């Protein structure tokens, strides 16, 4: 699974908040993916803070130590990452952060859909190019 299958488009709003469009649409899979990556998150509609105490709503919140949080907000089609980039306080860049989430999301979504279609997960192998090779088996 290569994270390059996801295309990100950044939209700058009038405030300091940046919305980054994703192809993430299944909330439970996003939440599982964040947990798999040991990223602490909170659920339910809450407000995140940005520059000068500006606020923005999000359904999934990742708290940052600097009190300027990261959120995932449903836009009617998919979840957008919403944050004030001026206060980004993660160990990785925004792109690397999203690539990690996207890759884990794809892995979890494939596993979920495959199971629904009577496939059984056998193993996953990390490849040298950073992708993940999944082995699934059809069971009767």
Language model regions located:
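Short, Lys/Arg-enriched N-terminal segments with co-localized hydrophobic residues
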Residues: 1-13
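Interaction-mediating elements
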Residues: 10-140
């Amino acid at each position: 699974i290569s994270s390059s299958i996801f295309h990100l488009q950044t939209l700058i709003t009038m405030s300091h908040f940046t919305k980054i469009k994703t192809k993430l649409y299944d909330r439970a899979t996003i939440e599982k993916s964040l947990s798999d990556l040991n990223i602490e998150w909170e659920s339910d509609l809450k407000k995140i803070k940005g520059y000068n105490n500006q606020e923005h709503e999000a359904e999934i919140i990742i708290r940052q130590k600097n009190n300027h949080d990261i959120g995932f907000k449903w836009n009617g089609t998919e979840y957008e990452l919403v944050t004030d980039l001026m206060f980004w306080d993660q160990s990785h860049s925004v792109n690397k952060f999203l690539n990690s989430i996207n890759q884990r999301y794809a892995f979890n979504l494939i596993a979920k859909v495959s199971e629904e279609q009577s496939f059984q997960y056998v193993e996953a192998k990390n490849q040298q190019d950073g992708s993940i090779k999944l082995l699934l088996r059809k069971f009767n």
